[in-house]
Amino acid sequence: MSRARCHALFLAAVSPRGATTRVAVRRGLSAWPVLQEPDMEYQDAVRTLNTLQTNANYLEMVKRKRGDPQTQLEAMKLYLARSGLQVEDLDQLNIIHITGTKGKGSTCAFTERILRSYGLKTGFFSSPHLVQVRERIRINGQPISSELFTKHFWRLYHRLEETKDDSSCVSMPGYFRFLTLMAFHVFLQEKVDLAVLEVGIGGAYDCTNIIRKPVVCGITSLGIDHTGLLGDTMEKIAWQKGGIFKSGVPAFTVLQPDEPLAVLRDRAQQISCPLYLCPPLQALEEGGPPLTLGLEGEHQRSNAALALQVARCWLQQKGYQDAGELKASRPSLPGQLPLAPVFQPTPRMQQGLRHTEWPGRTQLLRRGPLTWYLDGAHTTSSMQACVRWFRQALHRCERPDSGSEVRVLLFNSTGDRDSAALLKLLQPCQFDYAIFCPNLAEMASTDNADQQNFTVTLDQVLLRCLAHQQHWSRLHEEQVSPDPWSTPGQEQDGPASLLLAPHPPHTHSASSLVFSCISHALQWITQGRDPLFQPPSPPRGLLAHPVADSGATVLQEAADIHVLVTGSLHLVGGVLKLLEPSLSQ
């Protein structure tokens, strides 16, 4: 049987029953076919979307034989044309394009919320999703409904199916490309006033970078991540991120190390892009009240400063008068980037910052004796910020009058990230237990397609969890360095201190466990003290460890249990799905 025939049979197996009328590709929004669709449920749509994920073995082959990245952008333009749009159609979306290594999602969230406070209808495309894939496409801050997602998914899927060439090596776009295309169509159909577009990976060759004329661009803090795709130095990564610059389109960035900042400056000059350096948020607060941010953590101030500049620039470009009164200008130093304006944030800007929500980033949930600290940090720099936030939050907590306090780490890391370096940063938090599990909500779960991931095998992720456990054990065996978070001469009980309150180690200190899925890990951590989770029945889901029983007793008797979930946004999403079942409705 031919490869094309096999592929056709496979698509028939996963596609919904029923047929659609074939139509020729026509440009513009009017090109949608009139579909006679059967009752296609949301989960069916997501399962079909998941067939566009690259299987693990094929993904490895692609990495070894990666072609010209510029060709990938040309392919994306072809997909766009097959979907019924041309690149120039995207100009009307008034796009804000944001990239960076850390904080780009939070910066997008701040920016979107600020502009929504002006009464504008906003679109927001982000990745990854935490619980449901429809979170990636938002209108006015809310994920599109299951019904709207399903409708747009099948329209786009059938359009691409009808226009594919079976002789082509790539007949359908991959998962992320498909969702990017879908976001463009949703935003145009919903007639948003603007679209905030978060880059997937990198910038220069990311599929979001097919846009021609964004209104403004932003680059958040840079760091080392996705080295297999972007390069293994800050300079190489900065070059990739600067690829979103467009001639004549204003761009803003935050303070970066000298070398990558120089790369961004040179890249902007080559492209004739006016690039500005954002003053710190403190400069915008001078002479006015301190700004309250809806997202916790000191590192969010940098993201908020960038969001304010980007939002103000967008408002000015679109002729809005109420965009913040300028303060005294600060001259730029010779050879450095020009500084962005220092202005007084308007009441609507302040409101937007205050009401920003972005789940899974410095998020805190209290449920009885358990407090969950959720942050998807996955680079060394973002993990430093996560640890600082976690320790400051613990410092503010009231200590129990009686009973013990237990600290638990729930961790996973994926891809080519250096998990040993991340775990070393977490060690000074004095965890009693370190729990490792894959980003799999439940074992053998087929009822929720949103959480399915075909790009890795179960064997691979479990072996990686065991490697995390070994790294953690070695760190404690080596009795690593004094606390890197303390400052010489700093008073341990001072208000600015990051040192934790005294936390006498238990006899099981630094113990670690590996579970086969998130659900089993949460059952063990909660020990029946959360009505959502039944007490575990050892050794269900547990790769055997001698301290499981003794640890269960400690958790059952503890007055307070503090759980930090970090290392992967997908892990955080799986935990949120189980802690907040309403998010899956």
Swiss-Prot record:
Cofactor requirement: a monovalent cation
Sequence positions that bind Mg(2+) 2: H226
Signal sequence extent: none
BP GO annotations: one-carbon metabolic process; tetrahydrofolylpolyglutamate biosynthetic process
Range annotated as the organelle transit peptide: 1-39
Enzyme class, first EC level, given as a word: ligase
InterPro entries: Folylpolyglutamate_synth, Folylpolyglutamate_synth_CS, Folylpolyglutamate_synth_euk, Mur-like_cat_sf, Mur_ligase_C_dom_sf, Mur_ligase_cen
Entry-linked PANTHER family: FOLYLPOLYGLUTAMATE SYNTHASE, MITOCHONDRIAL (PTHR11136:SF5), FOLYLPOLYGLUTAMATE SYNTHASE-RELATED (PTHR11136)
Assembly mode: Monomer.
Protein name, entry field: Folylpolyglutamate synthase, mitochondrial
Species of provenance: Bos taurus (Bovine)
Lineage: Eukaryota, Metazoa, Chordata, Craniata, Vertebrata
